[in-house]
Structures are given as C-alpha cells and as structure tokens.
Amino acid sequence: IYVPFWLFDADVAADGKYAATMVRTWSDAHYNYTETNHYSLLRSATMTYERVPVDGSSKLDDRLMQSLEPFDFKGAVDFQTAYLAGYLADRYDQSADISLEQANQRIRQSTENRLANTVQGYGNVRKEDGSIRLNNGEPIYVLYPVWLLNTSWQKKKYTFAMNGQTGKFVGDLPLDRTAYWTYFLSIFLVMTLLIYGLVWLFYWMM
C-alpha cells in the first residue's frame, strides 16, 4: 500500500540553561573530605531539519509508521496515477496543519536531547530553563510504499509493517506466555540439576 505522508522542514534556534555539579572525595589520616563544585552551564545551537515525516492517515498507528523510518526521498518522482497500477493507495485524512504539530513535537524533543547531550563530564545535571524556536517551511505531500500484514492470535489483533524501500520490518510479535514459562522453567531445572551434579562430582573427587 502507498501510505500518505507529510514532510516538514524546520530551522531551529535553541537555548538551554543547566545546573551541574562535580563531587570530589579524598581522605587523610584524620578526616574524610568531600568537595562539591557547582556550575551554571549555557548552551545555544542552531539546527536544520529536513523532510521530517508524519503519516497523514488516522487509520494507521503513528508509532508503527515512525518505526519504519528512515524513508529515502532521493528517488522521489512527481506523482502519476500509472505508478499506482496494481497497488492500493490511501489518501490523507489528517491535514498538514494537524500533522505539523506532531512533526514539531518530534523536532522539539530531538533538539532538546541533542542540546542536553552536549553537557558531558559532570556528576549530576539538571535543566533549569530553555527555549526552542522553530521556523517551518512549506510541507511536502508524498506517498511512501509500505507492506502491511494484519493477523490475529488468541482473539487479539496484530499489525506488522515493512518499509517498501529498505525492507525494514516492524511489529509486536504475539507471545505464548504458557510456552515461554514452560521453556524457561525447563532450562532452569536442567541447569540446576547440572550444577548440582557437578558439585557432587567435585565433592567425591576430593
């Protein structure tokens, strides 16, 4: 199936203020010492995000579609109906405005994580303040190829998906808990008996 996606660009300016500490301990013949240094750290960065995808179909699980990333935009071509011959194609039912907020949430979270990762080498770090400013470009509407498989097991439905470009396969596999615990307990019992036997063998050899 061809799944509708909105692609978003953004130029980002971000600032962060962090409180950090470093603790040093040492001892002499009489006392134990602890030295705590406190730091106020400022971080600023500009970042550019290109073609952040958000699926435009409310019928599809956003988490599942995000797990299929990345998609390759380099081979994109202008749309022609002939490309859909023999395939299913979904049409977006979530507008670019709605999808924009989802994209910006991902961009903000990624920016915050990347900024925080620049604070290294301290024992404890706490964020005190920060701001993220976004300037979005015009969205692009695309169709990406995705293979979908729906199945059910023990009255529960499962959906699997595969990226039609890269072959990346995602989904939650059903788990037979009875079989799992039977297998686990069997292995545990075998290992227990094996260890017990080795201990007795070692004891009699002594």
Task: Go through each PLM region and give its residues.
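Juxtamembrane amphipathic/hinge helix adjacent to a transmembrane helix
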Residues: W153-D176
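Juxtamembrane/start-of-transmembrane alpha-helix segments at the extracytoplasmic/lumenal side
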Residues: L173-F188
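Charged, low-complexity helical/coil segments in non-catalytic cytosolic or luminal regions
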Residues: I1-K157, T178, Y203-M206
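Juxtamembrane boundary at the C-terminal end of a transmembrane helix
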Residues: L193-M206
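Alpha-helix boundary/capping detector
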Residues: T34, L175, L193-I195
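Short, well-ordered alpha-helical packing segments
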Residues: D9, L189-V190
